[in-house]
From Swiss-Prot:
Entry-linked Gene3D superfamilies: 1.20.1270.10, Substrate Binding Domain Of DNAk, Chain A, domain 1
Pfam families: HSP70 (PF00012)
SUPFAM superfamilies: Heat shock protein 70kD (HSP70), C-terminal subdomain, Heat shock protein 70kD (HSP70), peptide-binding domain
Entry annotated with the keyword ATP-binding: yes
Domain of life: Eukaryota
Lineage: Eukaryota, Sar, Alveolata, Apicomplexa, Aconoidasida
Descriptive protein name: Heat shock 70 kDa protein PPF203
Keyword entries, A-Z: ATP-binding, Nucleotide-binding, Stress response
Record flagged with keyword ATP-binding: yes
One GO MF term attached to the UniProt entry: ATP binding
Length: 201
């Protein structure tokens, strides 16, 4: 069982053939400044990208207070009971707000044949999936790095400690990399990695 993260990459929470009942949780966050909500999408399958897996259900967690990206902490819990019924809960740790979805065995779940086919496909496209996943992760890492630098430069407590010229130079670099990211949505892993090396302060 999975949920989707930025760029359509799957985050695997429960492995195939896990003994039930079982419960797993993981912390996720926002990927835009002042993002008011997050969409939790639950998938079943073996592939690295969401588009190649089976969507079981989705729900929205709203009411996240304005904050820079990556600051809110959203705890997502997958809980499968002894009957195979899946409860997925998303909790905003800052406000205590939560929402959930229940997915029963008959709700769009894959048959054994479908699962076998997906396992075979996962093996067949393993290399391609890995390349896609690495590319998107490299892009996300570069974007996160830029936003972390930007937030640091705008932090009131640190502003006085960084010389104004350095701060302006760094901010200019960060903005140009974010513009480049916007225009190069499908660059290769190496390009994103090189860009991150060039941007390190």
């Amino acid at each position: 069982e999975f949920r989707e993260t930025a760029g359509g990459v799957m985050t695997k929470l429960i492995e195939r053939n896990t003994t039930i009942p079982t419960k797993k949780n993981q912390i996720f966050t926002t990927y835009a400044d002042n993002q008011p909500g997050v969409l939790i999408q639950v998938y079943e399958g073996e592939r690295a990208m969401t588009k190649d897996n089976n969507l079981l259900g989705k729900f929205q967690l709203e009411g996240i207070p304005p904050a820079p990206r990556s600051v809110p902490q959203i705890e997502v819990t997958f809980d499968i009971d002894a009957n195979g019924i899946l409860n997925v809960t998303a909790l905003d740790k800052g406000t205590g707000k939560q929402n959930q979805i229940t997915i029963t065995n008959d709700k769009g779940r894959l048959s054994k044949d479908d699962i076998d086919r997906m396992v075979n496909d996962a093996e067949k496209y393993k290399e391609e999936d890995e390349q896609n996943k690495n590319r998107i992760e490299a892009r996300n890492n570069l974007e996160n790095y830029c936003y972390n630098v930007k937030n640091t430069l705008q932090d009131e407590n640190l502003k006085t400690k960084i010389p104004k010229d350095d701060s302006e130079k760094c901010m200019k670099t960060v903005k140009s990399v974010l513009d480049w990211l916007e225009k190069n949505q499908t660059a290769e892993t190496e390009e994103y990695n090189e860009k991150e090396k060039d941007t390190e302060f």
